[in-house]
C-alpha cells in the first residue's frame, strides 16, 4: 500500500532516533541508510524478476528483506545481519561499501536484549515501504526520503562531520547554472573531485533526462565514499565511477588519461573550506613557495597559500575541464578578494576569461560552516572572447530553518533566470567589465560593484502609524514609488504639501486609508488582473484530469512555470513570491495526496492503513503516528480522506452522540472542580480531609481493625478518624 511521503519521512527519522542512543549522528546514519539500501535492492530485485528485466544488483536467496524481518527478536540478529550483508557485498563487488557497518557492535548498539530490541525495531521501520514497483515514482520517493535523512543527519552531525552533504537547493542551483537539461546527452561527463555523498553529482545527472549523465567522483573519506556508492545505486546510477576512498584529489587524483588529468564536460564541487593541509603529498619549494612535483601543471597560474587550499581545488577543477567544459564550485567568500598569492591567481584566471560569473550566497547555508560562501561559475568555451563577469548578490535571499539558513525555491529560480538572461537588476545583479575589475585590482568582492539595497518599511499603514502624526518624511515615501506608478492617483489622494520642510501631510484620517485604497478603481483593476492571471493557469481543468502514474514533481514544475509566465504580466507583484506560494502549497498540502493518487488512484481512499507499533524495552507498543481510528484495539490511519469527513459521512449519528456525551462529561468535570475549590477553604467541608498516599499508608499501618485494612471503602473513614 502506498504511504504518504511526509509520514514516510517521520517514520524513517523516528527509526533513526530510536537507534541513536549514545551514538553520534555521523555513526548511526550508516545503520539506517544501510537498511534503506537493503530494502531497496530487495524490492528492486523482486520486481525485476517479476517483469523479467535486468537487475543491476544480485540478491542471493536468504538475503531478501523478508529474511531480515524474520530475524526480529532473534538472539543473533546482529551477527546474522552482518552475514546477509557480507554475502550481498561478495556477489556485487560491494566489499568495503555496505559491509563497513557492524550490526553486532555492542559498544554502539548495546548488549544482549538492548541490541536485539534496537535492531528488531529498526528493521521494522522499512517493512511497509514498497520500492521498485512504480518506476520513476519510486525513484522520486526514495530519492526524497534519502535526501530527508541526509539533511537531518548532517544537521545533527555537528560542524566537523556534516560536510558530506550539500543542501539540495544548492545542488540544484549549481546544476542549473551549468545549463544541464533534458536535452543534455548521456555521454556528457560530470565530475566532482570532492563528491561527499554524491548529492551534487546526482542532482546534476537527474536534470539530464531519463538516462542521466556519465558520472565520476572522488572522495577522501572512506566511509563517505561508501555512502556515495550506495547513493548512486539507490538513484539508478550503479555504473557511476566513484574512486575508492583514502586518498586526496589534490595529491593523488584518481582519474588520469595518458599521464594527464582526465577532462570532463562538467565539474561541480563543494570542497572543504580553507583546507589547511592541502599540500599533504605535494612538495613546496621553501624559497619560491611553488609546488615542484605536480606532473599535471595544475599550478601554472600560481600556488595557493600553504595553509589555505581554496584556490588549489579551483585550479584542479579548471584543469579537469575540457576546452568547452563548464564548472560551478562553492567556495568561501574570501576567494573573491584575498590578496597576495591568491590575488595573483585570481588575476590570471580573469585574464584568461575562465570565470563567467560570481554569485554571493547567504551565510550559514552549509552544515560544515556558517561563513558566507559564493558560487564561482566557470566556462572555458569562448573564454578568450569574454569581456566581463556577471555578478549576483543573493546574500539576502534565504529562509530560516532551525539554526541554519536555506535557499527557497524562489531564490534558486530567480538566480537562474537572471543569470541565463544576464539581466541587470538594481541592487541584485550586474555585468561587470574586465576593465572595471582591472581598475579594482582584480578584486571580485561583490559589494564593490553592486550597492546593497536599503531596507525600508514595506507596510504603508505601519509607516504612517509609526510616525504617530500627520507628517511623513518624503525620503521614506519614495520607497513606494512602484506602487504609485500602478495606483497613479493614490499619492495625491493620500498626501499634500506641508509647512514642514521635507515632509508630506496626510489628507485623510489614518483609519480611512485602507478603505480608500481598496475601493478605488485603480485597486479594483489591479485585483482583477491578479484573478485573471490565476484563471489563465487553468488549474481546475489540470487537476480534474490526473491519471494514475502521473509524476507529481513534473506536474508542479509545469504549473510553476506557468505561474512565472502569467504573473510577470501583473504589475508590482513579485512573480517569484507567487511562485513560492505555489511551491509551499505543494510541499505542505498537495504532494502527499498527489503521490497517493499517482500510485493507486482513488483506491487509497477506500482503505485504512494499519499502524504497526514498535516495542520499547518493556514491550509496550509505541506508535510513530497518531491514529485516526481505533478499531478493537487496532490503530488505523486514513491517508487520503480526512478523518472528519469520514466521521461526517458514515458516523454522523455516533459523532453527535459522542459530542453530546463529551459535553456532558466536561460539564460534570467543571462542576466537580468548582465543588472541590469551594469546599477546600478554611471553613469548607474538606478542610480537615487531608488525604494523600503517605497519610493513607500511615493510617492503615496504625489501624487495628483488619476490615479497615482490607476494605478500600474504609480509607476515608480511617484518614479522618
Q: Where are the model-predicted features located?
A:
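Non-catalytic, mostly N-terminal accessory regions of nucleic-acid modification and defense proteins
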Residues: 1-182, 240-254, 360-363, 391-393, ...
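Conserved Class I SAM-dependent methyltransferase catalytic core
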Residues: 7, 11-14, 18, 27-37, ...
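Conserved nucleotide-binding/hydrolysis micro-motifs of P-loop NTPases
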Residues: 38, 43, 197, 222-223, ...
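Hydrophobic alpha-helical scaffolding
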Residues: 112, 135, 194, 214-221, ...
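Conserved S-adenosyl-L-methionine
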Residues: 160-269, 273-290, 295-301, 311-312, ...
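Hydrophobic alpha-helix feature that most strongly marks membrane-spanning transmembrane helices
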Residues: 209, 233, 237, 272, ...
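A generic structural signal for well-ordered coil/turn residues at beta-strand boundaries
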Residues: 263, 267, 371-372, 385-388, ...
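Conserved P-loop NTPase
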Residues: 375, 379-416
